[in-house]
Amino acid sequence: MASIPSFPLWPRPVRRLFGPLETSARGMGIQQRFLDTIATNIANAQTTRTPEGGAYHRQVALAGADPATGETMTVVDPTPGRMVYDPGHPDANADGFVEYPNVDVSVETVDLMMARRVHEANVSVFQAAKSMLRRAIDL
C-alpha cells in the first residue's frame, strides 16, 4: 500500500494547516486495509483448498507501531481450522475429515462494522478540516 505523502518542503505554518487532512487521510488508508482484509476473510470463509495447499487461514491487518506513517501489515492467524467429517468431500484426508478455514463470519462482521465506523469518522474529520481550510482561505 502506498503511503500518503507528507509535506516536508512546505513552510511549517502551511504544514500545520494540512496536518488534520493528512492525519485523517492516513487513518482512512489504514481502515481501508482493515476493510479489505476482513472482506477477503469473509469471501474465503468456506475455502478448503488454496493454491498453497490446505484450507484458507484468516488474515489480520495490523497498524504499524507508528500510526503517523500509515503503514499496515497483514499477518496470517495460525489458529488451526475446524475439522469436519465429510468423507465424500474432494479435500477430505485419509480419515475422511476436511479442514475448514479458521474464519468466524460473526467475528468478521463485528470487525467490519467497527472498521467501517472508524473509516466514517476519519471521513468526517477530513470533511471538517477541509471546510475549515476553505473558510480560512476565504478570509
Question: What does each model-identified segment do?
Answer:
Residues 1-139:
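Amphipathic alpha-helical polymerization modules
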